């Protein structure tokens, strides 16, 4: 990707791109990147599950379909909320001070359309079906959203840090934290690891330690219950036990 000059996106002389020094952690540690890492992780896990299913060279059975539908429903909720965050919160907020890259906004409808194709393919699965169509659509989806998220981190995130101080973002971050689905935070914790989340990310974001005990640990448990247990069952080829059966939501 060519060198990205944040000054090229300045909207007004009243808001110069001079805020980077106020950020006391590198861009790759930002929560925006954490969400992207989690979404990529979910996409990779489901791809592994689909590959394991295809390797068995037989049609799907009922419990496998339920596991696929449950895990994907969580991913769909996560990615839909994330795009809502960006389109309705972050982007309008950033446009107060920067010329937000047009391509990033134009990408979302295309990605969402492909995700809808995946959703339709999953919803119509019946016993005996193969995963041929789904795996093709899933790869197309992953190949679209992955580079898009990388581009956001290489452009929009740099603009955010150049034109805004961390405290400027507090109202936006608080809204997202309070209103986002449990799955989103649970996924971020899972792919970041509990240790890094508690010892580094919570400290970085000035989140009091007690919040782990009253909130975050339950979000992680929800993600594991609804996504990880279903994906692991698919990979192992073992129907979930009563205590960890698929939960359709």
Question: Would you name each region that the model predicts?
Answer:
Residues 1-249:
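Small-residue-biased structural context
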């Amino acid at each position: 990707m060519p060198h990205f000059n944040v000054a090229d996106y300045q909207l007004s002389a009243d808001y110069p791109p001079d805020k980077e020094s106020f950020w006391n952690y590198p861009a790759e540690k930002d929560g925006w990147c954490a969400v992207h890492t989690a979404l990529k992780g979910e996409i990779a896990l489901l791809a592994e599950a689909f590959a394991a299913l295809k390797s068995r060279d037989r049609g799907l059975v009922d419990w496998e379909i339920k596991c696929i539908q449950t895990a994907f429903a969580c991913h769909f909720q996560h990615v839909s909320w994330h795009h809502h965050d960006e389109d309705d919160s972050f982007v309008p907020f950033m446009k107060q001070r920067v010329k937000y890259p047009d391509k990033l906004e134009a990408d979302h409808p295309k990605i969402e359309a492909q995700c809808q194709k995946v959703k339709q393919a999953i919803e119509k699965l019946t016993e005996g079906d193969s995963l041929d169509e789904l795996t093709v659509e899933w790869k197309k989806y992953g190949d679209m959203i992955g580079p898009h998220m990388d581009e956001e981190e290489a452009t929009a995130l740099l603009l955010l840090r150049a034109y805004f101080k961390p405290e400027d973002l507090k109202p936006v971050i608080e809204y997202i934290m309070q209103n986002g689905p449990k799955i989103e935070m649970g996924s971020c914790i899972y792919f970041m690891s509990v240790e890094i989340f508690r010892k580094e990310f919570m400290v970085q974001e000035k989140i009091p330690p007690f919040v782990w005990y009253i909130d975050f640990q339950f979000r992680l448990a929800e993600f594991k219950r609804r996504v990880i247990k279903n994906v692991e069952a698919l990979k192992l080829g073992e129907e979930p036990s009563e205590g960890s059966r698929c939960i359709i939501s």
